[in-house]
């Protein structure tokens, strides 16, 4: 976790809106740019709690699977934020991605695998950094919604409210587990769109997905402990169970 007091903040201006009067901000709400004492910049998502949790865990998982992605850090609460829950995402020098000239097809396939595993709901956003294809924006993932409601129930500290919160989390975990059963890597249309051999793409995607099995339980617990610096234990357990569900499902892959 980063101490939010060590950063200075300014509004983030999306370049896509400069020449498009109809452009609107995404589901994450208004963003900030955070800058540390050394000049390092971060994109700050601070409006909704599920954004912070999903971005942190999504980037953590990408790193564990050796998939190019920015680093992400939870932030301590700050009056500059619209909620108590914020995440600092490494601000990268992104270059446009040209699907007609894919120099690192394994990177592209890896991003497709990551999006499938985390049940990413938004369109996959691809850019290029240091000649590698990176993905970003994992805010709508892991089948977790209603997090404001869940956190509100947990804060009530009554057995009824706790049971309601856990019940909602169990429903969402069930939805995530079902999403894993729909994961498949034999997509001829995707392969054709990016000039990939479908059979080779499927083999590569399967091999990348099996990297999930390398993640040790103590590494998952470390991720969970980071979450617990900001979120209640019930939320960290949810993400632990998501990773365990991935591992259990991937074991069945040939």
Indicate residue ranges for each PLM-predicted region.
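Short, low-complexity, polar/charged sequence segments that are solvent-exposed and flexible
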Residues: 63-65, 105-108, 153-157
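Low-complexity, flexible helical/coil segments
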Residues: 79-81, 123-126, 169-176
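Short acidic, gly/pro-rich beta-turn/loop elements at beta-sheet edges
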Residues: 44, 72, 99, 146, ...
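Generic low-polarity alpha-helical segments
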Residues: 2, 63, 87-92, 124, ...
């Amino acid at each position: 976790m980063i101490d939010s007091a060590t950063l200075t903040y300014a509004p983030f201006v999306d370049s896509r809106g400069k020449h498009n009067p109809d452009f609107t901000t995404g589901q994450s709400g208004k963003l900030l740019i955070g800058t540390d004492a050394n000049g390092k910049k971060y994109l700050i998502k601070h409006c909704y709690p599920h954004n912070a949790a999903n971005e942190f865990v999504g980037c953590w998982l990408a790193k564990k699977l050796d998939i190019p992605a920015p680093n992400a850090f939870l932030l301590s609460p700050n009056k500059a934020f619209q909620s108590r829950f914020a995440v600092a995402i490494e601000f990268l020098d992104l270059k446009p991605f040209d699907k007609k000239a894919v120099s690192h097809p394994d990177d592209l396939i890896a991003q497709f695998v990551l999006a499938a595993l985390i049940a990413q709901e938004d369109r996959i956003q691809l850019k290029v950094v240091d000649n590698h294809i990176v993905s970003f924006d994992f805010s709508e993932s892991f089948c977790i919604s209603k997090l404001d409601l869940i956190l509100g129930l947990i804060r009530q500290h009554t057995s009824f409210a706790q049971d309601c919160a856990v019940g909602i989390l169990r429903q969402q975990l069930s939805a995530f587990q079902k999403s894993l059963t729909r994961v498949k890597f034999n997509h001829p249309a995707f392969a054709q769109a990016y000039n990939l051999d479908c059979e080779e793409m499927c083999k590569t995607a399967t091999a990348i997905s099996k990297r999930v099995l390398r993640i040790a339980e103590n590494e998952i617990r470390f991720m969970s402990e980071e979450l617990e610096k900001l979120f209640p234990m019930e939320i960290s357990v949810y993400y632990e169970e998501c990773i365990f569900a991935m591992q259990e499902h991937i074991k069945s892959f040939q």
